[in-house]
Amino acid sequence: MSFEVLEKLEAKIQTAVDTIALLQMEVDELKEDKAKLETEANELRAQREQLEQKAQQTQQEHAQWQERIRALLGKMEDVE
């Protein structure tokens, strides 16, 4: 092989190495982004579960208050 061909081959190899390095950095960034998104998704799931539990608790309390009010109204009707 001539010296020119070797220089061209070296340039192509260097370009490939540079491209691989850039792609690896991009992959690393994407992995970090993915990890952050997974953490955020898990936090949001936990918050949603807490809100669902709170909503259920509030509904139960509401039902209990309605029952108490009905009982009081029934007693008031009995008094009249």
From Swiss-Prot:
Keywords: Cell cycle, Cell division, Coiled coil, Cytoplasm, Septation
GO biological process: division septum assembly; FtsZ-dependent cytokinesis
Residue ranges the record marks as coiled coil: 3-80
This protein's GO CC annotations: cytoplasm
Keyword Cell cycle belongs to the record: yes
Subcellular location: Cytoplasm
One Pfam family here: ZapB
Physiological role: Non-essential, abundant cell division factor that is required for proper Z-ring formation. It is recruited early to the divisome by direct interaction with FtsZ, stimulating Z-ring assembly and thereby promoting cell division earlier in the cell cycle. Its recruitment to the Z-ring requires functional FtsA or ZipA.
Oligomeric form and interacting partners: Homodimer. The ends of the coiled-coil dimer bind to each other, forming polymers. Interacts with FtsZ.
Annotated family: Belongs to the ZapB family.
Protein name (Swiss-Prot/TrEMBL): Cell division protein ZapB
Organism phylogeny: Bacteria, Pseudomonadati, Pseudomonadota, Gammaproteobacteria, Vibrionales
Gene name linked to the record: zapB
